[in-house]
């Protein structure tokens, strides 16, 4: 099959006709299928073992659990999984890409949708209709620009000073309490449950476009995002924790940022343990030497993740399929 295939849609509404629906993990009991995987092989058995590690994290009352999000699973139908992890006290803090939090979660909180599409669609035709593609998922670019502008409008109303991404996202949560079109977003749920969200590469998203417009309108009195203070804030959470565990979706900046808190604490002269538990769900190949694909065993050589607890490194797509 060729790389592109014209599906003969000729109007925007034809492309944006089938919404992505987010899976509701509270609507069924997955424990039996997960436990049955213990006797299987490959990713199935790894999934069952990862589940055991996560259950250990939850049972460990001294463990601070960090959820990291990278990639586009939020747009693909997994957003409510992460929301419910916050809602049911299964995570204590989140480190994510700006795209996961703003372009996907905040975007839907404003009432917009992601749509089922095709990876074979002619991308020139999509561009002609102002539609963005994430593999087989479509986004209305006009709606995404509303998201950009809304971020700028939120910034316009804040006191002009420096904010960490956590502080700014908290302001977004406050905004959503009265302005959301879709209730129960990850941002709003985290706001309600006092769970901090950090986006170390915050401006690499719709937030960046919105904040650039904000600064253009307010050249002398505007907000800024202080990523250094943000790193210190996250490190302080690690320092104050008796133990910690990582549940990592994808890799990238969020993965490295949370792991580096151990090194930062050491450089500040603090005696902290490495992350005790770690699970990574990814499709990256460790042979390319990239951060996203690096194994958790490799992270132990940097002093980031302890090897005393079994760690699991899983393929993202099969795990979410199960």
Q: Which residue ranges define each predicted feature?
A:
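Glycine-rich anion-binding loop/nest that anchors nucleotide
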Residues: 65-74, 94, 198-202, 219-291
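Short acidic, glycine/serine/threonine-rich loops at helix termini
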Residues: 77-80, 105-111, 208-213, 258-261, ...
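Glycine-rich phosphate/diphosphate-binding loops that line cofactor/substrate pockets in enzymes
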Residues: 51-64, 189-191, 236-243
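C-terminal functional extensions of proteins
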Residues: 2-18, 243, 267-322
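Short, solvent-exposed amphipathic alpha-helical segments in soluble enzyme
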Residues: 81-87, 111, 213-217, 262-269, ...
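A generic, well-ordered mixed alpha/beta core segment in the N-terminal half of proteins
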Residues: 82-148
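Ligand-binding beta-strand-loop-alpha-helix segment within the catalytic cores
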Residues: 125-207
């Amino acid at each position: 099959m060729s790389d592109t295939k014209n599906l003969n849609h000729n109007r925007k509404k034809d492309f944006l006709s089938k919404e992505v629906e987010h899976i509701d993990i509270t609507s069924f009991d997955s424990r039996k299928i997960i436990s049955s995987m213990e006797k299987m092989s490959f990713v199935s058995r790894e999934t069952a073992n990862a589940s055991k590690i996560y259950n250990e994290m939850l049972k460990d009352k001294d463990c601070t659990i960090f959820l990291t999000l990278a990639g586009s699973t939020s747009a693909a139908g997994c957003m409510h999984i992460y929301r419910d992890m916050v809602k049911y006290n299964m995570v204590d803090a989140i480190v994510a890409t700006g795209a996961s939090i703003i372009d996907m979660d905040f975007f839907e909180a404003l009432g917009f949708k992601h749509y089922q599409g095709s990876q074979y669609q002619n991308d020139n035709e999509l561009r002609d209709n102002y539609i963005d593609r994430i593999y087989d998922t479509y986004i209305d670019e006009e709606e995404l620009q509303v998201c950009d502008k809304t971020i700028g409008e939120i910034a316009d109303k804040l006191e002009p000073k420096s904010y960490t991404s956590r502080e700014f996202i908290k302001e977004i949560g406050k905004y959503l309490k009265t302005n959301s079109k879709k209730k129960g977003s990850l941002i709003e749920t985290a706001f309600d449950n006092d769970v901090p969200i950090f986006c170390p590469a915050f401006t690499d998203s719709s937030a960046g476009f919105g904040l650039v417009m904000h600064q253009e309108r307010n050249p002398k009195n505007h907000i800024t995002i202080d990523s250094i203070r943000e790193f210190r804030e996250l490190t302080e959470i690690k320092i104050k924790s008796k133990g910690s565990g990582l549940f990592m979706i994808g890799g990238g900046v969020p993965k490295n940022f949370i792991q580096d808190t151990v090194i930062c604490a050491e450089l500040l002269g603090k005696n902290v343990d490495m992350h005790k538990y770690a699970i990574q769900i990814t499709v990256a190949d460790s042979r390319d030497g990239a951060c996203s694909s690096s194994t958790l065993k490799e992270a132990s050589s940097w002093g980031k993740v302890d090897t005393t607890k079994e760690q699991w490194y899983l393929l993202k797509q099969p795990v979410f399929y199960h």
